Amino acid sequence: MDFESHIEKIRDKRHWWTTVDTERYSWNDIMHLVDTHPNDEYDWNRDKQRLGMNSFHRRPSAPQFAKDIFKDMEDFFVSRAPAKSHSEYEKGPPQITNIAFCGFGKYTGSYPRHKDSMDVFLVQVIGDTPIRIGYTEKRTENDEDRIMKPGDAVWIPRNTWHQLTPVASRVTFSFGFESDSDCDPSTFI
């Protein structure tokens, strides 16, 4: 993923859209990923009919595009992040985390409108999922509403309000740049 070409929006803390070649990833592929994922890295939410697979990029069965995004984010963000001594970190050293969200059925849920303390790169892999992105806690006419389709991806800067409202089975990959608040990419990229 070419994060360099979006550097101004990253510095301005604005969300931006792109596409990712998801290699026509199928439900059979995702079920193989589910079946080969370690149980201790499952995050099953029964109320939301959703399975999360933490650190899924490490699986041999993970798609190459996900492994590439993880590496590209490490190279672009983690390698450029200001260094501190280990004892100075509140959350620990900057890192890339990821989770594959698999929602099953038309009542699959997500989180209510929220903001994350990390920067998020979200990739829609299977199914269509409505998303709303805004810059205030309450919904306004300035919010952006879209339906994410397979291959759609969006950069959501930390502290940006957003909400996915799934309406059918779906797979969404989430990659996060996690760091202390004083290590916001807008300040060092």
Please place each PLM-identified region on the residue numbering.
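Active-site region of the double-stranded beta-helix
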Residues: 5-8, 35-152, 160-189
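An N-terminal JmjN-like helical accessory module and its immediate linker preceding a catalytic domain
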Residues: 1-38
